[in-house]
């Protein structure tokens, strides 16, 4: 299956949803021909694989899966109830409190949160590049827009090579291709990579305690001078860019590393390489959970929605050795998977997020 919406079309789609998708009464819905899931580019290959299997076993229409980024998918999901809005939002982070409130405002009051597994964010290069070992404050000093200067004040980041950041790193130009602001992968990168790297600097660790807002601004604001390059929602495009631009670096989900390990290689963070085992255990520091959000008000209206969700969470799909592990999904521990399967069967409605 292909990515069914181009990035340029997503704004038009959302405007259309705002105009005609906010039929908030489940009783007034008309059934759509098939299931519609939209959101994270990282969850996209997992959702498309489940969609293919679901269509094959059910004999029905293949579910429509769109890669809009986590933020774009949740935005579309929260536009209302009815056939002009997605049944499922795919997300590489938890839904935010502000997004949950948008859903409620537009009549999407019954949302089921299901954790499907884990993913790690990898820092990768083409296979012929030298080995990097990132640690401590390396990522912050390379990619933050402002860093502490010699006198302790914050200055525009002057570092142009990795060896200027850390003499133990290669003397290659800092040029990192990564996810845009609409992506859940970007949110995860800022929280799991940039913020801890900033806290490795004593002055910033102190600032995190005394002025959290200022700390977050400094830790989460990436360079705009070409050292960091927003590369759209297609992680495969980043992989292709790395093969065409030797010396550059990319940030994307572990599943894309698994699919392209003949073209690119990952590098360690704090001495730990990303693997299924280190991501599942949390030993690899840039690890995260992935989710699907189901619009319960569409259950019983969109044909096959419950069946699709249960296929997604089945042992054969999301379990250890399941077909999604072949795509790079890091499975949940057995007990956690059983709990998520129970939530999916019961369609347990989530409570409001706190953040």
What function would you assign to each model-found segment?
Residues 9-11, 32:
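Low-complexity, intrinsically disordered short peptide segments enriched in small/polar/basic residues
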Residues 20-355:
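Flexible loop/hinge segments at secondary-structure junctions
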Residues 1-9:
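Bacterial N-terminal signal peptides that target proteins for export
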Residues 14-17:
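Bacterial Sec-type N-terminal signal peptides, specifically the leucine/valine-rich hydrophobic h-region
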